[in-house]
Each structure stands twice: as C-alpha cells, then as structure tokens.
C-alpha cells in the first residue's frame, strides 16, 4: 500500500512539473524569452507550494481536535485528503478507547470497595464513589493532592513509603473511627499505584469477638487446671501412698494437664500479641546474648540426644523491640529445630545484618516439611502430621506466635525445607528495627 501511495505522489509531482514546463515553454514562445519564462513558472510553482506548506503549518499549530484540514487541489489536495482520513481513523480509535475507559470507570464506580489511582509520586489521579464514602475524598478539589495529606494515619504513611505491599494494612477510616479499612496497594506501569480499600469492620468485629472469647475461656480454664495439676503433683510426690494400679493413669493425667497448661499459656500470649500492633517496650535488645541464653536452653532440651547446636551472632547488631516477645519467637524456632531433628543432628543459629536489615536463621538437619505445607505452617493449630505433634508435645501455636511477634517488630518469616534433609527458618527485620550496640569507651 505504501509503495502505491509513493508511486501516486511521484506521478502527480512529475505531472505538475511537466505542466509547469509546458506552460513556461508556451510563454517563452510568445515572449521570446525562454529562460525568464521558465524561471517565472518555477517561481510561481514554488510560491504556491510554500503557501500550501504555510497553510498546513498553521492548521497543525492552531487546529481544534475535530477541525478538518484546509481544502486544496492537485498534489496538495491529496496530502490534505490523506491527513483528513488519518484524522478520522484516529477519532474513531479514540472514541473506541474512550468507550472502554468509560465502561471501566462505570464498573469500578459501582464497586462497594474504594478504587484509587495514584501517580508515581503518590498524587491522586482518579477514584470512585466508594472512595469518597470511605475516605472522604472530594471531587474535584482533591485531584492531584498527595494521598498522605488526606490519609494522615502514621501507619499508612509508613506503609505507603516503604513500598512493601505484600501484606495488606488495616487502619481506622480517616472520617469515621468506627470503620475499619483494609488497604491493598499494587504497583503498575511507571511506578504508579492502584489502591483498593475495603470495609472490613464486620470481619474485624468478629475477629475481636473470637479473640475475646479465647482469652476469656483461657483465663477461666487456667485456675481449675492449676488446681488439678497441683493435686496431681502432690499425689505423684508421694508415690508410696498411691495404688500401683493408678500410678500410670496419674502420670498420664499429669502429662495431659501440662499440655493443656502450655496450650492455655500460648493462647493467652497470642491474645496479648493481637491486642496491640506494636510492643510497648520498644528498647534495644542485645540479640547475641539473648540467643546465647536460648542456645543453652536448647542444649538442656536436647538432653543427651547429642545435637550439635552452633551459634554465630554479630554482637554489634541489636534490635529495637520487646525482649520477652523476641525470646518467645526465637526460642520457638530453636526448640522446634531440637524437637524435629534426629539424634546427633546439627542445628545452626546465625544472626547478622546487611543493607536490607537484620536477619536470624535457624537451620537444622531434621525431617523437613513437604513444600505444599509451607504456606500454612504459621496458621493456628495447623498440623503437618498429627502424630508428630502428639509425640513432641507441641500446641500447634508456636509458629503462629512467631508470625505475630515478627509482624509487631516489622519483620517477616521465610521458610524453606527439603523433606529428609532439613529446614531453614529465617526472620528478616526491616532496617528501621536495627539498633547498633553502644561501644564502651576504653578504660
């Protein structure tokens, strides 16, 4: 098609030049000045061409989107006609695209969830009606405003700036504290943001009811269990007074009472962790000393199973947070490694820091976990193998506690495992949680 158009243009140009030459030749015959006649003819043709170029230039500079190009004839008539047809095609394509955009905007406007489009700098570009109802956005005066100026919650600003959107954020609505909103942010295009906001107030209320129920039941069961465990301990401390037929039954009762107490303690700890978003005592923690203490406890737990437990901890790297919560999380990881690693196996504990933050890894040569179970390991009471849990005395809440402690300390848990070869649990802490140890002045 392009070659045919080029041939038409060349043919039209040759015809126009031949016409100018013929007219100049006739004028030269009449006047007797062939050179001047030819020069005059070419000058007139050049002037006409320049005039058409000027018309095209003015149209391109000043025309409205739907204004057609100027009329002409001959070669320039074909140029303007082609521009007109191209303009019409673009108008039709633009109309189709606008119809698609309108349809998308109409469908998103009908959503009950808020949909907000932000540019690469976090400024508002477009939002639907639900965003106005949930966040109080106003059309059109909020257009172009930074989203952090309109949603002023400190956790939102921190969440938005860190650009780690793998987990959603839950905060109260900026216009109604009773509403609980969940934010999902996705990066697309040239670092632009698509933000989805959902009202999860009802889910939050049900979750709070569940937490309160578990906490209350745990508290109510704690006292009778303590009484039962105390009587069982008293009876077993006086074995000579116990009928031999009841001795094994009492020992089993004491074992199960101990498991119930551990379960209640874990449930109460989870309820405490879920009650607030951040630990109250956010102080620098000497992780190397903490891990050394946990390693000693792990060696005592190993109790003759000949585990090789090594520790490599950077003493200069500390964490800001709750020492009690960190001890609970780290000891859960290390004690699990001891429980699920065969006799004479190896457990490596490593603590270090780099430009991405601080990291704790617990690597073992245990039985490992099938990859299909890894995404659910941190769920409450999730069992890879129920018989395995009963043999080790676990409550099924250890990794759930680890997950909640890490969330409260701006960290995440990474799990890798190969069945039959072992597992590695790695805690990744954000740079903001890292605190350098104070260096003592030389004496």
Curated annotation (Swiss-Prot):
Annotated PAS domain residues: 93-182
Keywords for this protein: ATP-binding, Cell membrane, Kinase, Membrane, Nucleotide-binding, Phosphate transport, Phosphoprotein, Transferase, Transmembrane, Transmembrane helix, Transport, Two-component regulatory system
Phosphohistidine: modified positions: 219
Keyword S-adenosyl-L-methionine included in the entry's annotation: no
The species this protein was found in: Pseudomonas aeruginosa (strain ATCC 15692 / DSM 22644 / CIP 104116 / JCM 14847 / LMG 12228 / 1C / PRS 101 / PAO1)
Protein name: Phosphate regulon sensor protein PhoR
A molecular-function term among this protein's GO annotations: phosphorelay sensor kinase activity
Function: Member of the two-component regulatory system PhoR/PhoB involved in the phosphate regulon genes expression. PhoR may function as a membrane-associated protein kinase that phosphorylates PhoB in response to environmental signals.
Transmembrane stretches, start-end: 17-37
SUPFAM superfamilies: ATPase domain of HSP90 chaperone/DNA topoisomerase II/histidine kinase, Homodimeric domain of signal transducing histidine kinase, PYP-like sensor domain (PAS domain)
CDD domains (alphabetical): HATPase_EcPhoR-like, HisKA, PAS
This protein's record includes keyword Repeat: no
A GO BP annotation: cellular response to phosphate starvation
InterPro entries in the cross-refs: 2-comp_sensor_kinase, HATPase_C_sf, His_kinase_dom, HisK_dim/P_dom, HisK_dim/P_sf, PAS, PAS-like_dom_sf, PAS_fold
Limits of the Histidine kinase domain: 216-433
